[in-house]
Structure formats: C-alpha cells, structure tokens
C-alpha cells in the first residue's frame, strides 16, 4: 500500500494505544498490569469501534506486538455479558458503580446491550481468527446464530402491540413521517436488548452495522485459495467454489457440494464429538483426517458431494449476567440457543433514553420477546426451493 498512509496509520495506532484510555479499575486481582494486558472500562461500542480500526491496521501490516495486545483485549472483553449468545453490556465499569448509575438514570440496575458492540466484537474476532492470532470461530458462530439475528424485528403483530401500548410522541412534520411505519421497518435491527427481550427502539448506526455484520459472517463462511476451500462456519452459503447446505441446529449434518475445490479444510465446532463424526464423498465413507479442529478432505473433483454427519448435542448451561443479578438457564443445540429462562415480563429499566436526549417510560407491553424458537427443537431440517445467488469474488 501507500507508504505515507501506512506511516500515518502507524502513528494513529500508537496514539490509540497510549496508557490514557486503557487500564481498568474493574473488580479482580491487581497483580497484573491492566494497561499492558489491554484492560479497559467505559462505553463498550465507543471503545471497541476504535479497536476494530486497530485490528484492521495490525492484520494489514502484521504488527505482531499490536496483534498480541488485541488478542488480550478480545479475550478480556468477551468475559462481560454472555458471549455464548452474543450479549455484551453497553457500559463496562465496576459493578456497584454501574448499578448505581443505572438506578439513578434509568430506574433499574440492569444493563442492556447495544447492537454496535456485538458487531464490533464479531468484527474483531473475525479479523483475529483469519489472521491466526486466535481461534474464535465458535464465538462468531454463537454471536451470529443468537443475538445478532434475534435483534432483527420481523413480527408485525408484536410491533403493532408495542406501538399501541407506547407513550404518544410529539410529531414534527419536517422530520417525522407516520406513513406505513411498521411495514417500512420490518427487517430493521433494534439498537438495544436485554438477554430475553428487546426495546422496539433503534438508531441508524446499529441498524446498518448489524446488517453489515451478517454479511461479514456470511462472507467469511468459506474462503478459497489455490484449490483449497476453507470452510470456517457451518452456515448455509452459496459460493463460486462450494455450496454449503447446513442442517444445523436441527440435525448434525452438513452437505458440501463441490464446484472448484481440489481439497477442503472444514472447521468443526467445539461441541462436536470428533470420534463420532463421519464423512462421505459421493456416498462413500472416507478416512477421517484432522488438523486441529479442521477436517481434511482431499482428492476432490468438481461435482463431488461431501456429507459430514455427527450427533447433535443439546446442553443446559448456566450463565450469570451480574448487572441483572440473574443467572440464566440456557438450552442450546450446538451453538444455537433454543430456550432461556427466566423471562421476566417487566424490563429491568424503567425508562430508556433516545437520541434527542429525552426519556421514554417503559411498561411490560413494550417488550419484543426474543428466542421464540420452539421450531428449532425439531430434529429434521425443513427445506424449501429457492433461487440462489452466487457472489462473484
């Protein structure tokens, strides 16, 4: 790239990693230097969006020292909230301070997430994983399958219910429009959510960023170079090199329809029992060869069909979100959350602020329930016929 641009980027990166904003007074042992180990506190998205830029710079220039630092940042930051579902609190501070501030400002002690923070963490995890700094593909898979897609508003009936039970807003014709508002916003992504329900409220940054994050995860599902198809995520994806038909989370089955690959390297999630995995090429069982978590399939021809099967694993897990003072019981199939409890009807907060600086008083009828996923408890994947688009790289 351009030498002067690289020099400027290096200066910005050095400035952004000065001791000032880094270092945390959060709870925990203080024998480790918080600055040197990339500890931080404050507004999650405000901080993480800068780290996205640092990660882009570090992976582009192979700044190894900065990459190690960002690895520490990510592994520290993923401890807040519930990474297994992609829930990250909007603000990270010492617990007592956070609870006190939330109670004073919002009338409750919980801490909602922000979609942009989830996007930042996914983006950082993607860049670090693809650079070989860490293996965070299971984190990415969990974020995508859970809170990322759950942030999208698709239920017209529920949105109408929320509108009918919400305080009336002052309409300003020069900036507000009341024409088909719900219909025009189906598919938009809400800005804020608790672990079990969303606020039907959003700002445009979260809306745009979450759409972009879905594309980035889709794009990273498979990479291709010199005859090798690298499958990173077991998600449905059509590509010029291989089509992926994923039956997850209904059943442990993935079908890879080869177009150009001579060999494939397929990352198998941590929850899969590798000893129980089976692989067939054109219906013929082939020997299992591993490279870490990567299943190696070789000597492929265009038109070959690779079928990978394994037992679907269902787990019950406990995850504590301390600002809510709640331990959630989470039922997973693989990395997909299919149920969660408790599901309180009331919001943790009594009011929420908006971009105009005003507050909206909340009531239990204004919640948009998440994880209405009884259909995912079935053991056979539904199918439908669609026209698929192939992205040209």
Predicted features along the sequence, with ranges:
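Well-ordered alpha-helical segments within folded domains of soluble proteins
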Residues: 1, 41-59, 110-129, 203-215, ...
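Carbohydrate-binding/catalytic loop surfaces
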Residues: 26-50, 86-114, 156-204
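Solvent-exposed beta-strand/loop surfaces of large extracellular or lumenal domains
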Residues: 274-296, 316-323
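Structural helix-adjacent loops and short alpha-helical linkers that scaffold large soluble proteins
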Residues: 1-10, 58-71, 78, 128-138
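Surface-exposed beta-strand/loop patches in extracellular or lumenal glycoproteins
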Residues: 257-270
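Long, well-ordered core segments of solenoidal/helical folds
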Residues: 7-28, 69-86, 142-153
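C-terminal beta-rich recognition modules with glycine/proline-rich loops and embedded aromatic residues
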Residues: 70, 137-257, 305-393
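Hydrophobic, small-residue-rich alpha-helical packing segments that form membrane-like cores
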Residues: 1-49, 59
